[in-house]
């Protein structure tokens, strides 16, 4: 998947930014959220999040649902590195396992359970 955040900011800039965030907020995780291209789901209004490391993936999904004002009857799927993360994992655990070389965790969302990458 092409990440707009990576295209808009150099690797050096992203590394410096994530290091600053982690130093200032050690109990939080820097997350980039973008829609899977081609998905019919609503666009999100912001893509950078600072998430408490102790919330679960399921709780984070609820935050994203609320951000895009998705009705409860509509489905949403989160992907990290083209796979659906276990919903019981904490965001801190997911971050440690899947963070990018730049220090951010990249999460894609879609209304369909397909990657479309």
UniProtKB/Swiss-Prot annotation:
The modification Phosphoserine is found at residues 39, 87-88. It is found in: Cytoplasmic vesicle, Autophagosome; Endoplasmic reticulum membrane; Golgi apparatus. A lipid is attached at residue 116 (Phosphatidylethanolamine amidated glycine). The precursor molecule is cleaved by ATG4 (ATG4A, ATG4B, ATG4C or ATG4D) to expose the glycine at the C-terminus and form the cytosolic form, GABARAPL2-I. The processed form is then activated by APG7L/ATG7, transferred to ATG3 and conjugated to phosphatidylethanolamine (PE) phospholipid to form the membrane-bound form, GABARAPL2-II. During non-canonical autophagy, the processed form is conjugated to phosphatidylserine (PS) phospholipid. ATG4 proteins also mediate the delipidation of PE-conjugated forms required for GABARAPL2 recycling when autophagosomes fuse with lysosomes. (Microbial infection) The Legionella effector RavZ is a deconjugating enzyme that hydrolyzes the amide bond between the C-terminal glycine residue and an adjacent aromatic residue in ATG8 proteins conjugated to phosphatidylethanolamine (PE), producing an ATG8 protein that is resistant to reconjugation by the host machinery due to the cleavage of the reactive C-terminal glycine. RavZ is also able to mediate delipidation of ATG8 proteins conjugated to phosphatidylserine (PS). The modification N6-acetyllysine is found at residue 24. InterPro entries: Atg8-like (IPR004241), Ubiquitin-like_domsf (IPR029071). It comes from the Eukaryota. One of its GO terms (cellular component) is cytoplasmic vesicle. One of its GO terms (molecular function) is phosphatidylethanolamine binding. A lipid is attached at residue 116 (Phosphatidylserine amidated glycine). PANTHER family: MICROTUBULE-ASSOCIATED PROTEINS 1A/1B LIGHT CHAIN 3-RELATED (PTHR10969). Belongs to the ATG8 family. This is Gamma-aminobutyric acid receptor-associated protein-like 2. The gene is GABARAPL2.
């Amino acid at each position: 998947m092409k990440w707009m955040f990576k295209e808009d900011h150099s690797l050096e800039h992203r590394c410096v930014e994530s290091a600053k965030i982690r130093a200032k907020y050690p109990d939080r995780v820097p997350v980039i959220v973008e829609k899977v291209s081609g998905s019919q789901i609503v666009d999100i209004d912001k893509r950078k999040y600072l998430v408490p490391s102790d919330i679960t993936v399921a709780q984070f999904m609820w935050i994203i649902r609320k951000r895009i004002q998705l009705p409860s009857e509509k489905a949403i799927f989160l992907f990290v590195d083209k796979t659906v993360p276990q919903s019981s994992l904490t965001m801190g655990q997911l971050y440690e396992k899947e963070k990018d070389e730049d220090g951010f965790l990249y999460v894609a969302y879609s209304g369909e359970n397909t990657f479309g990458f």
